Amino acid sequence: MKFLDEAKVYIRSGDGGAGSVSFRREKFIEFGGPDGGDGGRGGDVWVEAVNGLNTLIDFRYQQHFKATIGTHGMGRNRTGANGSDVTLKVPVGTQIFEEDRETMICDLTEEGQRYCLAHGGNGGFGNAHFKTSVNQAPDWANPGLPGEEKTIWLRLKLIADAGLVGLPNAGKSTFLASVTRARPKIANYPFTTLHPNLGVATVDEREFILADIPGLIEGAHEGVGIGDRFLGHVERTRVLLHLVSAQEEKVGKAYKTVKHELEAYGNELTDKPEIVALSQIDVLDEAELKKKTKELAKACGRTPFQISAVTGRGMTEVLRALRDIIVQENAEEKPAKAPKLRHRDMIVSEENNQGEDGADDQP
């Protein structure tokens, strides 16, 4: 499946139906009075986070979503039918932005979260609504209110427990393939990985999700290479695994290059816990390995792990270190404050939404 992490979408909710101008007509009833019903409410446009998706590719082929209009009211005080809602199914981790691409509307981080992006117009009142003691036969009704329309941006930030970062050919995809069932493209040339890959790793019967993103090079924050846009996919991780290839001539410089790009990107990536590992050590003899390990330790300020996806050396130790930090970060996580919502805007989970489907159906 092709990967797409950003999409532009046009949405429009349904217009409300017009109220009816009608009078009761029955035999032997000379002045039946008004009986025009109200118009139906237009359909809403919703967005919902669902499992089983990890790309926005569907929105490349369909960019327009319109809810149906409410039907007009009818005589005998019959209210028009409400318009049908439209729901955009998106992956968990999708953010919705206004057309300026900066104003966030909502952030869907859990399965089943829903948000109303555009409310349908209310139906107009029929002439029966306007009957008073001084006007027994009003001959007017309200038109339905128009729906809302807007252009929005969908931006996907994958949700994973740990993120892999490093220069191109640092062995990130090889690491992912060796500890999970993911099958990313692996080759001996830079930028083999062109989009993020996810995999589930298991150590000591504990599972966690790893995210592999394309490699960073010097100047990535300025658009060099394929830029740093994919760093958004490791913003939500608990810990970063920074891989430095043992084949680099200067491993200390390689580490600092990636670290500088993380700092330039911002969004508190450098504040995340970090595990540093010297990868692809199977290509070195012991003397060279000792030398490069010492150089990398000096650059990062800690003793790096030594790993090889080919021989399996050090792999379990790294996974356990990742697991321990993830468990600790999850235990220390503070509940997020509920966002301030506008009138009638809702973010609800699927279980809280049961039995409330008709709550907003009144005109």
Swiss-Prot record:
Q: Which residues bind Mg(2+)?
A: 173, 193
**Which residues does the record give as GTP binding sites?**
166-173, 191-195, 212-215, 279-282, 308-310
* Signal sequence range: none
Q: Which GO terms describe its cellular component?
A: cytoplasm
| Gene Ontology process terms (BP) | ribosome biogenesis
The record places domain OBG-type G at: 160-327
UniProt lists compositionally biased (Acidic residues) regions at: 353-363
Q: What class of enzyme is it?
A: hydrolase
Task: Please list the cofactors this protein needs.
Answer: Mg(2+)
Pfam families listed in its UniProt record: GTP1_OBG, MMR_HSR1
Q: Where is the protein situated, by its record's location annotation?
A: Cytoplasm
Among the GO molecular function terms of this UniProt record, one is: magnesium ion binding
Its subunit composition reads:
Monomer.
Role: An essential GTPase which binds GTP, GDP and possibly (p)ppGpp with moderate affinity, with high nucleotide exchange rates and a fairly low GTP hydrolysis rate. Plays a role in control of the cell cycle, stress response, ribosome biogenesis and in those bacteria that undergo differentiation, in morphogenesis control.
Q: What is this protein called?
A: GTPase Obg
* Organism this protein belongs to: Rhizobium etli (strain ATCC 51251 / DSM 11541 / JCM 21823 / NBRC 15573 / CFN 42)
- What gene does the UniProt entry assign to this protein? obg
